[in-house]
Amino acid sequence: ZPIDLMGKVFVFDKELSPBI
């Protein structure tokens, strides 16, 4: 499920970089 993975990565990236 690439979509689920993308969503997880997006959330993870947002949590890591709250500046963006």
UniProtKB/Swiss-Prot annotation:
Record keyword Zinc-finger present: no
Primary localisation category: secreted
Family recorded in the similarity comment: Belongs to the pentraxin family.
GO molecular function: carbohydrate binding
GO cellular component, one term: extracellular region
Compartment list: Secreted
Keyword set includes Cell inner membrane: no
Protein name (Swiss-Prot/TrEMBL): Serum amyloid P-component
Protein's organism: Pleuronectes platessa (European plaice)
Subunit structure comment from the entry: Homopentamer. Pentraxin (or pentaxin) have a discoid arrangement of 5 non-covalently bound subunits.
Annotated Pentraxin (PTX) domain residues: 1-20
Keywords: Amyloid, Lectin, Secreted
